[in-house]
Each structure stands twice: as structure tokens, then as C-alpha cells.
């Protein structure tokens, strides 16, 4: 056992990747975190090996968010077996620090609800943008969810393009490139990735700002692809763990 400090285990199961982190109950920085590809056929034995790194911590709380519903029972059983606690799951009766209408409450993914929760902890007027398998954004006005926008992710689109273009199949694309203008096919693709990231954030922010001209609108950017965002027209915060933190906040709001 690491110490007597209580920890919360937070699980975010995405379509492509699963991220698991632990936090001290009273802190917002992750103590330990693991990331691995989501496997719809995973089992208790496999998960137990992955999460064994957390056994040394005094884990007394847990929340599991998932956009892959079939995996929830496996995670429930694994966490209960390893830590002797029952994880909390988001449901239609879950309370939030923001207002959400009935329809989006039923349809919006757990991860985006967690992003909303983190956003309103920063400011009552806020947009959150997640760059991952999908590009997703949420807009909150006066602590109320106005709406969201979802598009195919950069990695998915790039992989499909490389599959179709024979000249690109042996080329290495640097998704971390910050160049705005490409001088050949590869650097042009790298420029496109950079401009798509920054352009999506810029446009979504501006549309929200038009709807809320007199507010101090904040912008939170997160997700595995949230790097090299080049925007000078407004301030933004990049927090890779915003969604995990949102789940943590949801847990303690409901328990």
C-alpha cells in the first residue's frame, strides 16, 4: 500500500483508446496514468494485469465512463475484484454542475459530459474541444449546455488517405509538425493536420463568441491529438486530463 491517502480510480473507455488515471481525493493532478488500445473482447485477467500498477495505492473510489457499453460489466467486475469497491457509472439520473436537456442527456457520450463538467469548473461560459479519434466540441453558456459538434478525427482521416494513396504508404507523417505551408506532399499533409486542428478550434470559438458577445468565454482543449494548436486571436488552456478530471468531479458530486 502506497500510503493512507485516499485515491480515486478514473476510467475513460473510448472507441480507440482507454485511459485510466488515479487522483488523490483532494488534488487535480494525476498520480499515475496508463493508456492502451480499447479491446472490445478484453477480460478480467487482461485488465487485472494492466491495472496491477495501481494496487499499491489506497483506492477507495472509482468512476467508469464508456462509449463502449459492452465493456462496462468487465470493468465493474475487475475493479470490484481488485480494490473491493463498486465503480460509479454515469446514468440518466446523474447530477452535473451544468444544465443539460433530456435529449442530449440520453445521447451525449460520457466523455463529453465529463468535458462539460470540467469546463464549467473553469468558467460558466466555456467551450471544450477534444482532439482524438473524433474531434468533438461542447459549448456551455451560463452553466448550461448549448450544444456540441463532432467530426471524424484527424488520425482516422489521415490513415484512410494513406491507404488510398500508394505514394504515401511508405512515408512518415509528422503529426507534431507546426508548419503552416507545405513544400511537398508530405509537408503539405502535415500542414493540413495543423490547420485542421487550429481551424476547428478557431471557428467553433468564434461561433460561440457570436452567441455570447458580452461574456468572458474560456476555451479548454484536450485529447491525444491536442498539440501544436496555433491560435493567436484568443486564449485557451490545454489540459490533457480535462476529461478524467471531469469524471472525478462528477463522481464526488454524486457520492
From Swiss-Prot:
Acyltransferase as UniProt keyword: no
GO cellular component: cytoplasm
Catalysis performed (reactions): (R)-pantothenate + ATP = (R)-4'-phosphopantothenate + ADP + H(+)
Keyword terms of this UniProt record: ATP-binding, Coenzyme A biosynthesis, Cytoplasm, Kinase, Nucleotide-binding, Potassium, Transferase
UniProt-listed GO biological process terms: coenzyme A biosynthetic process
Main EC class the enzyme belongs to: transferase
EC number: 2.7.1.33
Subcellular location: Cytoplasm
One Pfam match: Pan_kinase
Protein residues bound to ATP: 12-19, 133
Keyword Kinase: yes
Cofactor remark: A monovalent cation. Ammonium or potassium.
Active site annotation, chain numbering: 111 (proton acceptor)
UniProt binding sites for substrate: 109-112, 185
Highest taxon above the source species: Bacteria
Biological or metabolic pathway of the protein: Cofactor biosynthesis; coenzyme A biosynthesis; CoA from (R)-pantothenate: step 1/5
Cofactor(s) needed for function: NH4(+); K(+)
CDD domains per record: ASKHA_NBD_PanK-III (cd24015)
Signal peptide extent: none
The protein's role, per its UniProt record: Catalyzes the phosphorylation of pantothenate (Pan), the first step in CoA biosynthesis.
Family to which this protein belongs: Belongs to the type III pantothenate kinase family.
Subunit (UniProt): Homodimer.
Protein name as catalogued: Type III pantothenate kinase
Gene source species: Malacoplasma penetrans (strain HF-2) (Mycoplasma penetrans)
Amino acid at each position: 500500500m502506497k500510503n493512507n491517502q485516499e485515491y480515486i480510480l478514473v476510467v475513460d473507455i473510448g472507441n480507440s483508446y482507454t485511459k485510466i488515471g488515479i487522483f488523490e481525493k483532494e488534488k487535480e493532478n494525476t498520480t499515475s496514468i496508463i493508456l492502451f488500445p480499447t479491446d472490445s473482447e478484453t477480460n478480467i485477467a487482461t485488465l487485472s494485469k494492466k491495472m496491477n500498477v495501481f494496487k499499491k495505492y489506497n483506492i477507495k473510489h472509482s468512476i467508469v465512463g464508456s462509449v463502449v457499453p459492452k465493456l462496462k460489466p468487465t470493468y465493474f467486475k475487475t475493479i470490484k475484484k481488485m480494490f473491493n469497491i463498486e465503480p460509479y457509472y454515469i446514468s440518466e439520473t446523474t447530477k452535473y454542475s451544468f444544465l443539460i436537456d433530456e435529449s442530449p442527456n440520453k445521447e451525449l457520450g460520457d466523455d463529453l459530459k465529463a468535458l462539460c463538467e470540467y469546463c464549467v469548473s473553469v468558467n460558466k461560459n466555456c467551450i471544450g474541444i477534444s482532439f482524438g479519434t473524433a474531434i468533438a466540441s461542447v459549448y456551455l453558456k451560463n452553466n448550461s449546455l448549448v450544444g456540441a459538434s463532432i467530426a471524424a478525427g484527424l488520425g482516422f482521416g489521415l490513415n484512410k488517405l494513406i491507404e488510398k494513396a500508394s505514394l504515401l504508404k511508405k512515408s512518415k507523417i509528422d503529426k507534431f509538425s507546426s508548419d503552416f505551408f507545405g513544400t511537398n506532399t508530405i509537408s503539405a499533409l502535415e500542414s493540413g493536420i495543423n490547420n485542421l486542428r487550429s481551424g476547428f478550434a478557431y471557428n467553433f470559438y468564434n461561433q460561440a463568441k457570436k452567441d455570447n458577445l458580452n461574456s468572458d468565454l474560456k476555451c479548454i482543449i484536450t485529447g491525444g491529438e491536442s498539440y501544436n494548436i496555433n491560435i493567436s486571436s484568443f486564449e485557451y488552456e490545454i489540459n490533457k486530463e480535462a476529461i478524467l478530471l471531469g469524471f472525478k468531479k462528477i463522481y464526488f458530486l454524486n457520492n
